[in-house]
From Swiss-Prot:
Protein's recorded name: ATP-dependent dethiobiotin synthetase BioD 2
EC numbers: 6.3.3.3
Family annotation (InterPro entries): DTB_synth_BioD, P-loop_NTPase
A Pfam match: AAA_26
Localisation per UniProt entry: Cytoplasm
Family designation: Belongs to the dethiobiotin synthetase family.
Keywords from the named record: ATP-binding, Biotin biosynthesis, Cytoplasm, Ligase, Magnesium, Metal-binding, Nucleotide-binding
GO biological process: biotin biosynthetic process
Length: 213
């Protein structure tokens, strides 16, 4: 049975998609079979754009599971929160469908990297948020952060809410992009590294290379 990691971020557009592809490639280079899954994609049609980015970073073609919609069971046209995108198309996002797709992938691969939509508390239907989904499944989390102003606050809030829900954090991925104020960026990286060493020593701290996609 595959190991499932859930990739989320401290904010929208923090680099979850790039980080998911990067981490998948890293595991592949260690000899593992890896597939990425997008929980829900908004703002596109057809095959999820984030999956295309994952495959490009991994250096592989689209898989049969991509073409069958297993790696992204819900794609919506309007670029907004999943619950609103579904409402606009008069559709319902059902947790069971996402779970079934993940289970199918787990039968074939060593690792499934499941990328969420937005941050931890984004609603995916009228009743449930991403955090609720995580609490139900207890997938270990890979949290993506960066060095932009405000990231320390957002990262600590995310870590603390995950801890309060007893959801384990496997790793924090530090995204070097965008290259902003280097004084702030370097201090953010050092602060977060020290914080994890003190309060969450089993959580890995990974610095992601700058990637051009």
């Amino acid at each position: 049975m595959a190991k499932v990691f859930f990739i989320t971020g401290i904010d929208t557009d923090i680099g979850k998609t790039i980080a998911t592809g990067w981490y998948a490639k890293k595991l592949m280079q260690q000899g593992a079979s890896v597939i990425t899954q997008k929980m829900i994609q908004t703002g596109c049609r057809g095959i999820a754009e984030d999956l295309l980015t994952h495959r490009k970073i991994q250096g592989i073609e689209l898989t049969e599971e991509d073409k069958q919609g297993i790696t992204c069971p819900y794609v919506f046209d309007y670029p907004c929160s999943p619950h609103l995108a579904a409402k606009l198309e008069q559709r319902t996002i059902e947790r069971k469908k996402i779970e079934t797709c993940t289970a199918l992938l787990c039968e074939k691969y060593d690792y499934v990297l499941l990328e969420g939509a937005g941050g931890l508390c984004v609603p995916y239907n009228e009743e449930e948020t991403t955090l609720d989904y995580l609490c139900q499944h207890q997938y270990p989390v890979i949290l993506v952060t960066s060095g932009k102003l405000g990231s320390i606050n957002h990262t600590l809030l995310s870590l603390q809410v995950l801890n309060s829900k007893r959801v384990s954090v496997h790793a924090v991925i530090y995204n070097l992009y965008p290259e902003t104020d280097q004084v702030i960026s370097q201090e953010t990286q050092h602060f977060l590294r020290r914080y994890l060493e003190k309060y969450s020593p089993n959580t890995l701290f990974e610095v992601m290379d700058l990637i051009s996609v």
